[in-house]
Amino acid sequence: MSQYRVFVEKKEMYATEAKSLCHDLNENLHLSLTNVRTINVYDVFNVNGQEIETAKQNVLSETVTDIVSMSLDLEGKTYFAVEFLPGQYDQRADSAIQCIQLLTGNDEVRVKSGKVIILDGIASEVEIEKIKQYYINPIEMREKDLQAPLSFDENVEIEDVPTYEGFIDYSDELLNNFLHEHGMAMTLDDIKMIQAYFRKEERRNPTETELKVLDTYWSDHCRHTTFETLIENVTFESGRFHDILQQTFEEYCMMRERVHHNRKPMTLMDMATIAMKEQRKLGSLNDLEVSDEINACSIYIDVDVDGETEPWLLMFKNETHNHPTEIEPFGGASTCIGGAIRDPLSGRSYVYQAMRISGGANVLETVEETMEGKLPQKIISKRSADGNSSYGNQIGLPTTFVREIYHEGYKAKHMEVGAVVGAVKASDVRREKPEAGDIIVLLGGRTGRDGIGGATGSSKAHTETSIQTASSEVQKGNAPTERKIQRLFRNGEVTRLIKKCNDFGAGGV
């Protein structure tokens, strides 16, 4: 078995990506480039001569539109090459591997992808560096060395999960230092509670995995701890809206008395859910499905199916991906819609419609006006739109409402909201409690380095250096795999076997 490097470039009449990039660089960086070429690079491993020929002709290129070569003349040319960071999910490479395996029967084939950018009309080294800074987002990619020997090293040394010896005896000062050293999102009070539990109940020190899981699922991203902040001493400033705000607040206080007799603390979460709880108490939400599964809002509806009325479940879910989209727009926006789909999908429903609402600052401002430590607003706006569109197109989901709001406040952080609706026949769903001996299935794509710590990363305060230090906290979307799960769950024989199902997102640990 051998290894090969294949270069694939669009013929001039089809080189829309290269022409678009040339226009983009000239307009936004005030350059005078005369031409740009973009060449996809495939490093293919563990194949023989016949298999690489099959891959070149049938997988890596299209005969009508592409030029394929095993070498690339870069003599005297100004260029740079890029590739994904090690461990990042590379959908182009993954798709190539699957196709080559299907065509050749070779299960050992491996592929890495990259891209070469050739620039004509560069006046200085300063311009090259300017282009690299604009094009390369260090969160997801790096420069590729075309002179380095081909290598594909998937070997990972699996170490024993460490136990934090002495943890249950740490002082408050040591616990606080521990939080900072391990980059955790939880508070000192959180970790003190964990320490007390392990000291009194488990009578042992915790492992790294146990603390990481708790840090993830206790994070603001997962548990919305910000909305549980206690609200005290509420007053309203005098002004145009004083009376209506005061009246609304008093109505809320009366609802609290009617619903739970003020036994629960006043929080933003209580404000957000109190109306629904009152409606349910009054018997106005009898169509709401209530279960132990916390996936998506689910209500019972009657559906006319070929003239006969059938009970179905209609599910709604929305998700924000503000932080991920701010630092890696394409991946953040694509996994926003992907994550929103995953929740009603976990409820066994088929998601058939979506909407996207986003918020950005002035997308017309120049690159030079970009705040330090942030991506240009136009980059965030364009690439996030591409990410949402890419994921939706691949999974086959129509997005029937799209709106981007522009306000200077979104310069602090981009807003990315995805919302979906799905449905499933009620008789194809069962909600039961798991029991000892039940089979547990973990279903989905392979986990890469991307996305690890995503939930806790979204829950921490961010600084000017966040874009350099959060390199693994934005997951790469894998729409084809989620589409396979969607198709599997459309089979009632499958869903009727499932007692309980929950989305296992938030990036992993």
Question: Where is each model-derived feature located?
Answer:
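Functional cores that coordinate and move charged inorganic groups
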Residues: Q486-V509
